Swiss-Prot record:
It catalyses: (6S)-5,6,7,8-tetrahydrofolate + formate + ATP = (6R)-10-formyltetrahydrofolate + ADP + phosphate. PROSITE patterns: FTHFS_1, FTHFS_2. The gene is fhs. It holds the Pfam family FTHFS. This is Formate--tetrahydrofolate ligase. It comes from Staphylococcus aureus (strain JH9). The keyword ATP-binding applies.
Protein backbone atom coordinates (compact mmCIF):
# COMPACT_ATOMS: atom_id res chain seq x y z
CA UNK A 1 0.00 0.00 0.00
CA UNK A 2 1.41 3.38 -1.01
CA UNK A 3 1.03 6.20 1.50
CA UNK A 4 1.07 9.87 0.61
CA UNK A 5 4.08 11.82 1.85
CA UNK A 6 3.61 14.50 4.50
CA UNK A 7 4.21 17.12 1.83
CA UNK A 8 1.60 15.58 -0.50
CA UNK A 9 -0.95 15.52 2.33
CA UNK A 10 -0.14 19.12 3.20
CA UNK A 11 -0.48 20.23 -0.43
CA UNK A 12 -3.87 18.52 -0.75
CA UNK A 13 -5.23 20.19 2.38
CA UNK A 14 -7.53 23.21 2.22
CA UNK A 15 -6.34 26.07 4.38
CA UNK A 16 -8.70 28.53 6.04
CA UNK A 17 -7.88 32.25 5.84
CA UNK A 18 -5.77 33.16 8.86
CA UNK A 19 -8.27 35.82 9.95
CA UNK A 20 -10.89 33.06 10.34
CA UNK A 21 -8.51 30.94 12.43
CA UNK A 22 -7.79 34.00 14.59
CA UNK A 23 -11.48 34.76 15.01
CA UNK A 24 -12.16 31.19 16.18
CA UNK A 25 -10.21 31.90 19.40
CA UNK A 26 -11.21 35.52 19.79
CA UNK A 27 -8.21 37.27 18.22
CA UNK A 28 -9.39 40.54 16.72
CA UNK A 29 -8.19 41.68 13.31
CA UNK A 30 -6.62 44.63 15.11
CA UNK A 31 -4.27 42.20 16.93
CA UNK A 32 -3.45 40.28 13.75
CA UNK A 33 -0.46 41.11 11.53
CA UNK A 34 -0.91 38.91 8.42
CA UNK A 35 2.07 37.50 6.52
CA UNK A 36 0.09 36.52 3.44
CA UNK A 37 -3.21 34.63 3.56
CA UNK A 38 -2.39 31.76 5.93
CA UNK A 39 0.07 32.95 8.56
CA UNK A 40 0.32 35.95 10.83
CA UNK A 41 2.00 37.45 13.83
CA UNK A 42 0.04 38.45 16.91
CA UNK A 43 0.39 41.78 18.68
CA UNK A 44 0.32 40.48 22.26
CA UNK A 45 -0.39 43.97 23.60
CA UNK A 46 -3.83 43.69 22.01
CA UNK A 47 -4.69 40.33 23.60
CA UNK A 48 -6.75 40.69 26.78
CA UNK A 49 -5.31 38.54 29.58
CA UNK A 50 -7.87 36.35 31.29
CA UNK A 51 -8.03 35.38 34.93
CA UNK A 52 -8.72 31.66 34.44
CA UNK A 53 -5.92 30.81 32.05
CA UNK A 54 -5.86 27.68 29.94
CA UNK A 55 -4.35 24.46 31.27
CA UNK A 56 -1.01 23.32 29.84
CA UNK A 57 -0.52 19.77 28.53
CA UNK A 58 3.10 18.90 27.77
CA UNK A 59 4.06 16.23 25.23
CA UNK A 60 7.43 14.53 25.69
CA UNK A 61 8.79 11.13 24.61
CA UNK A 62 10.93 8.14 25.41
CA UNK A 63 14.56 8.21 24.22
CA UNK A 64 14.20 8.44 20.43
CA UNK A 65 15.56 6.64 17.41
CA UNK A 66 17.49 8.92 14.99
CA UNK A 67 14.29 9.40 12.94
CA UNK A 68 12.31 10.64 15.96
CA UNK A 69 9.15 9.12 17.43
CA UNK A 70 6.53 11.54 16.13
CA UNK A 71 6.26 13.82 19.15
CA UNK A 72 5.23 16.82 17.05
CA UNK A 73 2.73 14.62 15.21
CA UNK A 74 1.15 13.47 18.47
CA UNK A 75 1.16 17.04 19.83
CA UNK A 76 -0.77 18.33 16.81
CA UNK A 77 -2.99 15.24 16.69
CA UNK A 78 -3.86 15.53 20.38
CA UNK A 79 -4.87 19.17 19.90
CA UNK A 80 -6.98 18.13 16.90
CA UNK A 81 -8.56 15.40 19.04
CA UNK A 82 -9.54 17.98 21.67
CA UNK A 83 -10.94 20.05 18.80
CA UNK A 84 -12.89 16.97 17.70
CA UNK A 85 -14.34 16.80 21.22
CA UNK A 86 -15.42 20.46 20.93
CA UNK A 87 -12.84 21.70 23.41
CA UNK A 88 -11.44 25.23 23.16
CA UNK A 89 -7.83 24.29 22.37
CA UNK A 90 -4.64 25.67 20.84
CA UNK A 91 -1.35 23.97 20.06
CA UNK A 92 2.00 25.67 20.74
CA UNK A 93 5.09 24.37 18.93
CA UNK A 94 8.69 25.31 18.23
CA UNK A 95 9.77 26.52 14.80
CA UNK A 96 11.87 24.07 12.75
CA UNK A 97 15.54 24.87 12.13
CA UNK A 98 16.91 24.74 8.59
CA UNK A 99 20.00 22.75 9.62
CA UNK A 100 18.15 19.57 10.66
CA UNK A 101 15.61 20.07 7.85
CA UNK A 102 18.42 19.71 5.31
CA UNK A 103 20.26 17.19 7.47
CA UNK A 104 18.28 14.26 8.81
CA UNK A 105 14.73 15.34 9.72
CA UNK A 106 13.47 16.79 6.45
CA UNK A 107 11.01 19.03 8.32
CA UNK A 108 9.36 19.33 11.72
CA UNK A 109 5.70 20.32 11.48
CA UNK A 110 4.12 17.00 12.46
CA UNK A 111 3.27 14.29 9.99
CA UNK A 112 0.52 12.54 8.06
CA UNK A 113 -2.87 14.04 8.88
CA UNK A 114 -1.57 15.70 12.05
CA UNK A 115 0.43 18.63 10.69
CA UNK A 116 0.56 22.39 11.04
CA UNK A 117 0.32 24.38 7.82
CA UNK A 118 1.54 25.95 5.56
CA UNK A 119 4.14 23.23 5.90
CA UNK A 120 6.58 24.51 3.26
CA UNK A 121 6.70 28.01 4.72
CA UNK A 122 7.09 26.88 8.33
CA UNK A 123 9.92 24.46 7.47
CA UNK A 124 11.84 27.00 5.40
CA UNK A 125 11.93 30.69 6.31
CA UNK A 126 8.50 31.09 7.93
CA UNK A 127 8.05 34.65 9.22
CA UNK A 128 11.75 35.47 9.48
CA UNK A 129 12.27 34.91 13.22
CA UNK A 130 15.40 32.77 12.85
CA UNK A 131 16.93 35.32 10.49
CA UNK A 132 16.31 38.09 13.02
CA UNK A 133 17.84 36.00 15.81
CA UNK A 134 20.85 35.14 13.65
CA UNK A 135 21.27 38.81 12.71
CA UNK A 136 21.03 40.02 16.32
CA UNK A 137 23.54 37.39 17.45
CA UNK A 138 26.04 38.24 14.72
CA UNK A 139 25.52 41.98 15.17
CA UNK A 140 26.72 41.51 18.74
CA UNK A 141 29.81 39.71 17.43
CA UNK A 142 30.45 42.66 15.10
CA UNK A 143 30.02 45.14 17.97
CA UNK A 144 32.50 43.17 20.11
CA UNK A 145 35.15 43.02 17.39
CA UNK A 146 34.63 46.68 16.52
CA UNK A 147 35.02 47.69 20.18
CA UNK A 148 38.35 45.87 20.37
CA UNK A 149 39.48 47.33 17.03
CA UNK A 150 38.55 50.87 18.10
CA UNK A 151 40.75 50.88 21.19
CA UNK A 152 39.14 48.34 23.53
CA UNK A 153 38.06 50.79 26.22
CA UNK A 154 36.54 47.98 28.31
CA UNK A 155 39.77 45.97 28.26
CA UNK A 156 38.15 42.87 26.77
CA UNK A 157 40.59 39.96 26.64
CA UNK A 158 40.20 38.63 23.09
CA UNK A 159 41.41 35.23 24.35
CA UNK A 160 38.42 35.03 26.69
CA UNK A 161 35.51 36.06 24.46
CA UNK A 162 32.66 33.61 25.07
CA UNK A 163 30.28 34.95 22.42
CA UNK A 164 30.21 33.05 19.11
CA UNK A 165 28.69 33.76 15.76
CA UNK A 166 25.77 31.59 14.57
CA UNK A 167 24.27 30.19 11.39
CA UNK A 168 20.98 28.33 10.86
CA UNK A 169 22.73 25.41 9.18
CA UNK A 170 24.62 22.26 10.17
CA UNK A 171 28.20 23.19 9.22
CA UNK A 172 30.99 21.44 11.11
CA UNK A 173 33.69 23.38 9.20
CA UNK A 174 32.69 26.55 11.09
CA UNK A 175 33.08 25.19 14.63
CA UNK A 176 36.50 26.80 14.98
CA UNK A 177 37.55 29.78 12.85
CA UNK A 178 40.01 32.67 12.97
CA UNK A 179 38.72 36.20 12.39
CA UNK A 180 40.38 39.58 11.94
CA UNK A 181 43.08 38.27 9.60
CA UNK A 182 44.59 40.31 6.78
CA UNK A 183 46.28 43.20 8.54
CA UNK A 184 45.38 46.13 10.82
CA UNK A 185 42.50 47.41 8.69
CA UNK A 186 40.62 44.12 9.13
CA UNK A 187 40.41 44.11 12.90
CA UNK A 188 42.23 42.29 15.68
CA UNK A 189 42.96 38.62 14.96
CA UNK A 190 41.39 36.13 17.37
CA UNK A 191 39.94 32.66 17.55
CA UNK A 192 36.18 32.43 17.09
CA UNK A 193 33.59 29.85 16.11
CA UNK A 194 30.01 29.31 15.02
CA UNK A 195 27.10 27.66 16.79
CA UNK A 196 23.84 26.72 15.13
CA UNK A 197 21.25 29.49 15.57
CA UNK A 198 19.04 27.39 17.84
CA UNK A 199 21.91 27.21 20.36
CA UNK A 200 22.25 31.00 20.48
CA UNK A 201 21.58 32.67 23.80
CA UNK A 202 19.53 35.20 21.82
CA UNK A 203 17.18 32.33 20.87
CA UNK A 204 16.87 31.29 24.52
CA UNK A 205 16.26 34.88 25.62
CA UNK A 206 13.56 35.42 23.00
CA UNK A 207 11.83 32.25 24.19
CA UNK A 208 12.05 33.18 27.88
CA UNK A 209 11.04 36.86 27.58
CA UNK A 210 7.61 38.20 28.54
CA UNK A 211 7.81 41.59 26.78
CA UNK A 212 10.15 43.82 24.80
CA UNK A 213 11.32 45.39 28.08
CA UNK A 214 12.06 41.94 29.49
CA UNK A 215 13.84 41.05 26.23
CA UNK A 216 16.02 44.15 26.48
CA UNK A 217 16.80 43.54 30.15
CA UNK A 218 17.82 39.95 29.49
CA UNK A 219 19.98 40.93 26.49
CA UNK A 220 21.74 43.55 28.61
CA UNK A 221 22.78 40.81 31.08
CA UNK A 222 24.50 38.60 28.47
CA UNK A 223 28.12 37.90 29.43
CA UNK A 224 30.13 38.23 26.21
CA UNK A 225 33.54 37.54 27.72
CA UNK A 226 36.01 38.68 30.34
CA UNK A 227 38.63 41.35 30.92
CA UNK A 228 42.28 40.46 31.42
CA UNK A 229 41.68 40.33 35.18
CA UNK A 230 38.76 37.89 34.68
CA UNK A 231 35.91 40.37 35.28
CA UNK A 232 32.74 39.65 33.25
CA UNK A 233 31.87 41.98 30.37
CA UNK A 234 28.19 42.31 29.49
CA UNK A 235 26.12 43.69 26.64
CA UNK A 236 25.14 46.51 29.00
CA UNK A 237 28.83 47.47 29.15
CA UNK A 238 28.84 47.71 25.34
CA UNK A 239 25.56 49.70 25.46
CA UNK A 240 24.02 47.86 22.48
CA UNK A 241 21.06 46.12 24.15
CA UNK A 242 18.64 48.61 22.59
CA UNK A 243 19.95 47.99 19.08
CA UNK A 244 19.78 44.21 19.49
CA UNK A 245 16.25 44.34 20.92
CA UNK A 246 15.22 46.55 18.00
CA UNK A 247 16.32 43.85 15.55
CA UNK A 248 14.03 41.42 17.41
CA UNK A 249 10.98 43.68 17.82
CA UNK A 250 8.90 41.67 15.33
CA UNK A 251 10.50 38.28 16.00
CA UNK A 252 9.26 38.38 19.60
CA UNK A 253 5.64 38.32 18.40
CA UNK A 254 4.13 34.79 18.29
CA UNK A 255 3.25 33.30 14.88
CA UNK A 256 -0.28 32.05 14.22
CA UNK A 257 -0.95 29.19 11.77
CA UNK A 258 -3.33 26.20 11.72
CA UNK A 259 -3.42 22.42 11.69
CA UNK A 260 -4.86 20.46 8.77
CA UNK A 261 -8.12 20.29 10.75
CA UNK A 262 -8.17 24.01 11.51
CA UNK A 263 -6.92 23.94 15.09
CA UNK A 264 -5.20 27.29 15.84
CA UNK A 265 -1.45 26.86 16.31
CA UNK A 266 1.19 29.20 17.71
CA UNK A 267 4.62 28.27 16.33
CA UNK A 268 7.32 30.40 17.90
CA UNK A 269 10.97 29.98 18.87
CA UNK A 270 13.04 26.88 18.37
CA UNK A 271 15.87 26.03 20.78
CA UNK A 272 17.13 22.43 20.57
CA UNK A 273 16.63 20.34 23.71
CA UNK A 274 19.98 18.54 23.58
CA UNK A 275 22.11 21.72 23.46
CA UNK A 276 19.63 24.36 24.69
CA UNK A 277 16.40 24.42 26.74
CA UNK A 278 14.21 22.91 24.00
CA UNK A 279 10.88 24.71 24.49
CA UNK A 280 8.81 27.14 22.46
CA UNK A 281 8.42 30.72 23.68
CA UNK A 282 6.79 31.67 26.96
CA UNK A 283 4.94 34.40 25.05
CA UNK A 284 3.34 31.87 22.69
CA UNK A 285 2.34 29.54 25.52
CA UNK A 286 0.97 32.38 27.65
CA UNK A 287 -0.88 33.90 24.68
CA UNK A 288 -2.47 30.51 24.02
CA UNK A 289 -3.45 30.27 27.71
CA UNK A 290 -5.23 33.63 27.38
CA UNK A 291 -7.16 32.39 24.34
CA UNK A 292 -7.90 28.70 24.95
CA UNK A 293 -8.98 26.39 27.77
CA UNK A 294 -6.37 23.76 26.86
CA UNK A 295 -2.89 24.40 25.46
CA UNK A 296 -1.00 21.42 24.04
CA UNK A 297 2.73 22.02 23.74
CA UNK A 298 5.92 19.97 23.42
CA UNK A 299 9.52 19.95 24.56
CA UNK A 300 12.36 18.41 22.59
CA UNK A 301 13.44 14.76 22.81
CA UNK A 302 12.72 12.83 26.03
CA UNK A 303 11.84 13.52 29.65
CA UNK A 304 15.55 13.67 30.44
CA UNK A 305 16.06 16.69 28.17
CA UNK A 306 13.21 18.92 26.98
CA UNK A 307 10.67 17.94 29.64
CA UNK A 308 13.12 18.37 32.53
CA UNK A 309 14.08 21.80 31.16
CA UNK A 310 10.43 22.72 30.61
CA UNK A 311 9.76 22.08 34.29
CA UNK A 312 12.98 23.44 35.77
CA UNK A 313 13.59 26.39 33.43
CA UNK A 314 10.55 27.42 31.37
CA UNK A 315 7.67 26.74 33.79
CA UNK A 316 9.70 28.17 36.67
CA UNK A 317 10.45 31.36 34.70
CA UNK A 318 6.87 31.69 33.43
CA UNK A 319 5.25 30.80 36.74
CA UNK A 320 2.69 28.30 35.45
CA UNK A 321 1.87 24.72 36.41
CA UNK A 322 1.41 21.65 34.24
CA UNK A 323 -1.98 19.95 34.09
CA UNK A 324 -0.82 16.75 32.34
CA UNK A 325 2.15 15.18 30.55
CA UNK A 326 1.98 12.81 27.58
CA UNK A 327 4.94 10.47 26.98
CA UNK A 328 5.14 9.35 23.34
CA UNK A 329 6.37 5.81 22.79
CA UNK A 330 6.81 3.78 19.62
CA UNK A 331 7.20 0.08 19.10
CA UNK A 332 10.31 0.68 16.98
CA UNK A 333 12.00 2.73 19.73
CA UNK A 334 11.16 0.06 22.30
CA UNK A 335 12.73 -2.56 20.04
CA UNK A 336 15.82 -0.40 19.52
CA UNK A 337 16.25 -0.07 23.29
CA UNK A 338 15.72 -3.82 23.48
CA UNK A 339 18.79 -4.42 21.32
CA UNK A 340 17.38 -4.65 17.78
CA UNK A 341 19.53 -3.22 14.98
CA UNK A 342 18.15 -0.31 12.94
CA UNK A 343 17.67 -2.44 9.81
CA UNK A 344 15.52 -4.97 11.70
CA UNK A 345 13.14 -2.60 13.50
CA UNK A 346 10.25 -3.39 11.13
CA UNK A 347 10.25 -7.09 12.05
CA UNK A 348 8.01 -8.35 14.87
CA UNK A 349 10.00 -8.92 18.05
CA UNK A 350 7.92 -8.98 21.23
CA UNK A 351 10.92 -10.06 23.32
CA UNK A 352 12.80 -6.93 22.25
CA UNK A 353 9.77 -4.79 23.17
CA UNK A 354 9.81 -6.44 26.61
CA UNK A 355 13.53 -5.73 26.96
CA UNK A 356 13.19 -2.12 25.81
CA UNK A 357 10.23 -1.23 28.01
CA UNK A 358 12.68 -0.23 30.77
CA UNK A 359 13.47 2.93 28.81
CA UNK A 360 9.82 3.97 28.68
CA UNK A 361 9.40 3.02 32.33
CA UNK A 362 12.15 5.39 33.42
CA UNK A 363 10.65 8.26 31.41
CA UNK A 364 7.25 7.60 33.01
CA UNK A 365 8.81 7.57 36.48
CA UNK A 366 10.70 10.77 35.69
CA UNK A 367 7.44 12.61 35.03
CA UNK A 368 6.02 11.37 38.33
CA UNK A 369 8.98 12.98 40.12
CA UNK A 370 7.63 16.37 39.05
CA UNK A 371 4.27 15.62 40.69
CA UNK A 372 2.30 15.07 37.47
CA UNK A 373 0.57 11.88 36.30
CA UNK A 374 1.90 10.79 32.88
CA UNK A 375 -0.18 9.37 30.03
CA UNK A 376 1.62 7.10 27.54
CA UNK A 377 0.72 7.53 23.87
CA UNK A 378 1.71 4.61 21.64
CA UNK A 379 2.27 6.41 18.34
CA UNK A 380 1.16 3.80 15.81
CA UNK A 381 3.36 2.86 12.83
CA UNK A 382 2.26 0.58 10.00
CA UNK A 383 4.82 -2.12 10.87
CA UNK A 384 3.63 -2.49 14.49
CA UNK A 385 1.99 -5.83 15.24
CA UNK A 386 -0.94 -6.55 17.54
CA UNK A 387 1.23 -8.71 19.79
CA UNK A 388 3.79 -5.92 20.27
CA UNK A 389 1.14 -3.30 21.04
CA UNK A 390 -0.74 -5.62 23.39
CA UNK A 391 2.41 -6.26 25.40
CA UNK A 392 2.89 -2.52 25.99
CA UNK A 393 -0.76 -2.15 27.00
CA UNK A 394 -0.46 -5.08 29.42
CA UNK A 395 2.70 -3.55 30.92
CA UNK A 396 0.84 -0.28 31.44
CA UNK A 397 -2.10 -2.04 33.10
CA UNK A 398 0.18 -3.98 35.45
CA UNK A 399 1.98 -0.78 36.44
CA UNK A 400 -1.14 1.40 36.73
CA UNK A 401 -0.01 3.69 33.89
CA UNK A 402 -2.55 5.44 31.69
CA UNK A 403 -2.08 4.53 28.02
CA UNK A 404 -3.75 5.01 24.64
CA UNK A 405 -2.98 3.81 21.13
CA UNK A 406 -2.70 6.93 19.00
CA UNK A 407 -3.34 6.88 15.24
CA UNK A 408 -3.25 10.59 14.46
CA UNK A 409 -0.72 10.20 11.61
CA UNK A 410 -3.29 8.14 9.70
CA UNK A 411 -6.59 9.50 11.01
CA UNK A 412 -5.92 13.01 12.28
CA UNK A 413 -7.84 14.13 15.35
CA UNK A 414 -10.19 11.12 15.29
CA UNK A 415 -7.15 8.90 15.83
CA UNK A 416 -6.30 10.74 19.04
CA UNK A 417 -9.67 10.80 20.81
CA UNK A 418 -8.79 7.93 23.17
CA UNK A 419 -5.62 9.77 24.17
CA UNK A 420 -7.52 13.03 24.60
CA UNK A 421 -10.05 11.36 26.91
CA UNK A 422 -7.26 9.92 29.06
CA UNK A 423 -5.61 13.35 29.28
CA UNK A 424 -8.93 15.01 30.16
CA UNK A 425 -9.28 12.69 33.16
CA UNK A 426 -5.82 13.73 34.36
CA UNK A 427 -6.49 17.43 33.78
CA UNK A 428 -9.57 17.26 36.00
CA UNK A 429 -7.56 15.91 38.93
CA UNK A 430 -5.38 18.05 41.23
CA UNK A 431 -1.63 17.42 41.10
CA UNK A 432 1.44 18.51 43.03
CA UNK A 433 3.56 19.90 40.17
CA UNK A 434 6.97 21.07 41.32
CA UNK A 435 10.47 21.55 39.87
CA UNK A 436 13.11 18.89 40.53
CA UNK A 437 15.41 21.14 42.55
CA UNK A 438 15.51 24.43 44.43
CA UNK A 439 17.56 27.23 42.89
CA UNK A 440 19.40 27.77 46.18
CA UNK A 441 21.28 24.49 45.74
CA UNK A 442 24.90 24.89 44.55
CA UNK A 443 25.38 24.33 40.82
CA UNK A 444 27.20 21.02 41.26
CA UNK A 445 24.38 19.67 43.45
CA UNK A 446 21.74 20.68 40.90
CA UNK A 447 23.70 18.85 38.21
CA UNK A 448 24.13 15.80 40.45
CA UNK A 449 20.39 15.77 41.20
CA UNK A 450 19.54 15.71 37.48
CA UNK A 451 22.11 12.99 36.76
CA UNK A 452 21.15 10.71 39.64
CA UNK A 453 17.36 11.23 39.78
CA UNK A 454 16.48 11.74 36.09
CA UNK A 455 19.27 9.98 34.16
CA UNK A 456 19.86 7.10 36.59
CA UNK A 457 23.59 7.77 36.88
CA UNK A 458 25.63 7.27 40.02
CA UNK A 459 28.24 10.01 39.83
CA UNK A 460 29.18 13.30 38.17
CA UNK A 461 32.79 14.03 37.32
CA UNK A 462 33.83 17.61 36.61
CA UNK A 463 36.82 18.24 34.36
CA UNK A 464 39.52 20.55 35.71
CA UNK A 465 38.15 23.31 33.46
CA UNK A 466 34.61 22.78 34.76
CA UNK A 467 35.86 22.81 38.37
CA UNK A 468 37.52 26.19 37.82
CA UNK A 469 34.34 27.46 36.20
CA UNK A 470 32.22 26.32 39.15
CA UNK A 471 34.45 28.36 41.45
CA UNK A 472 34.43 31.38 39.13
CA UNK A 473 30.65 31.27 38.59
CA UNK A 474 30.06 31.16 42.34
CA UNK A 475 32.33 34.18 42.82
CA UNK A 476 30.39 36.00 40.08
CA UNK A 477 27.07 35.33 41.84
CA UNK A 478 25.78 32.86 39.24
CA UNK A 479 25.28 29.92 41.60
CA UNK A 480 21.50 30.31 41.86
CA UNK A 481 20.75 29.84 38.16
CA UNK A 482 18.97 26.70 36.94
CA UNK A 483 21.00 24.18 34.93
CA UNK A 484 20.57 23.40 31.23
CA UNK A 485 22.24 20.08 30.46
CA UNK A 486 23.77 19.58 27.01
CA UNK A 487 23.66 15.83 26.40
CA UNK A 488 22.97 13.24 23.73
CA UNK A 489 19.26 12.59 23.21
CA UNK A 490 19.72 8.90 22.43
CA UNK A 491 20.71 7.70 25.91
CA UNK A 492 20.13 8.61 29.54
CA UNK A 493 23.93 8.68 29.81
CA UNK A 494 26.44 10.82 27.91
CA UNK A 495 27.27 7.81 25.69
CA UNK A 496 24.74 7.59 22.85
CA UNK A 497 25.37 3.86 22.39
CA UNK A 498 24.26 3.05 25.96
CA UNK A 499 20.58 2.31 25.32
CA UNK A 500 17.70 1.05 27.45
CA UNK A 501 17.79 2.25 31.06
CA UNK A 502 21.44 2.11 32.11
CA UNK A 503 22.39 2.72 35.73
CA UNK A 504 25.56 3.12 37.75
CA UNK A 505 27.26 5.17 35.04
CA UNK A 506 29.26 8.36 35.48
CA UNK A 507 28.65 11.55 33.53
CA UNK A 508 31.52 13.92 32.83
CA UNK A 509 30.92 17.66 32.72
CA UNK A 510 33.64 18.87 30.40
CA UNK A 511 32.74 22.56 30.41
CA UNK A 512 30.18 25.07 31.70
CA UNK A 513 28.73 28.07 29.88
CA UNK A 514 27.15 31.00 31.72
CA UNK A 515 24.03 32.18 29.90
CA UNK A 516 23.48 35.13 32.24
CA UNK A 517 21.05 36.81 29.86
CA UNK A 518 18.78 33.79 29.51
CA UNK A 519 19.37 33.01 33.16
CA UNK A 520 20.78 29.48 33.19
CA UNK A 521 24.09 27.60 33.20
CA UNK A 522 24.77 25.14 30.37
CA UNK A 523 26.64 21.98 31.41
CA UNK A 524 28.29 20.31 28.41
CA UNK A 525 28.65 16.52 28.62
CA UNK A 526 30.39 13.91 26.51
CA UNK A 527 30.99 14.84 22.87
CA UNK A 528 27.89 17.03 22.43
CA UNK A 529 28.38 19.77 19.80
CA UNK A 530 26.67 23.16 19.63
CA UNK A 531 27.26 23.23 15.86
CA UNK A 532 26.08 19.95 14.30
CA UNK A 533 27.39 18.46 11.08
CA UNK A 534 25.49 17.03 8.14
CA UNK A 535 25.17 13.24 7.67
CA UNK A 536 26.82 11.40 4.77
CA UNK A 537 23.57 11.53 2.80
CA UNK A 538 21.68 14.64 3.95
CA UNK A 539 17.95 14.98 3.36
CA UNK A 540 18.84 17.85 1.01
CA UNK A 541 19.80 15.27 -1.65
CA UNK A 542 16.10 14.47 -2.09
CA UNK A 543 14.90 18.07 -2.19
CA UNK A 544 14.04 20.24 -5.17
CA UNK A 545 11.67 22.95 -6.26
CA UNK A 546 9.27 22.72 -9.20
CA UNK A 547 9.17 25.26 -12.01
CA UNK A 548 6.10 26.82 -10.43
CA UNK A 549 7.82 27.21 -7.05
CA UNK A 550 6.59 24.24 -4.99
CA UNK A 551 8.97 22.35 -2.72
CA UNK A 552 9.79 18.67 -3.21
CA UNK A 553 11.32 16.40 -0.58
CA UNK A 554 10.16 18.01 2.66
CA UNK A 555 8.70 15.19 4.71
Amino acid sequence: MTHLSDLDIANQSTLQPIKDIAASVGISEDALEPYGHYKAKIDINKITPRENKGKVVLVTAMSPTPAGEGKSTVTVGLADAFHELNKNVMVALREPALGPTFGIKGGATGGGYAQVLPMEDINLHFNGDFHAITTANNALSAFIDNHIHQGNELGIDQRRIEWKRVLDMNDRALRHVNVGLGGPTNGVPREDGFNITVASEIMAILCLSRSIKDLKDKISRITIGYTRDRKPVTVADLKVQGALAMILKDAIKPNLVQSIEGTPALVHGGPFANIAHGCNSILATETARDLADIVVTEAGFGSDLGAEKFMDIKAREAGFDLAAVVVVATIRALKMHGGVAKDNLKEENVEAVKAGIVNLERHVNNIKKFGVEPVVAINAFIHDTDAEVEYVKSWAKENNVRIALTEVWEKGGKGGVDLANEVLEVIDQPNSFKPLYELELPLEQKIEKIVTEIYGGSKVTFSSKAQKQLKQFKENGWDNYPVCMAKTQYSFSDDQTLLGAPSGFEITIRELEAKTGAGFIVALTGAIMTMPGLPKKPAALNMDVTDDGHAIGLF
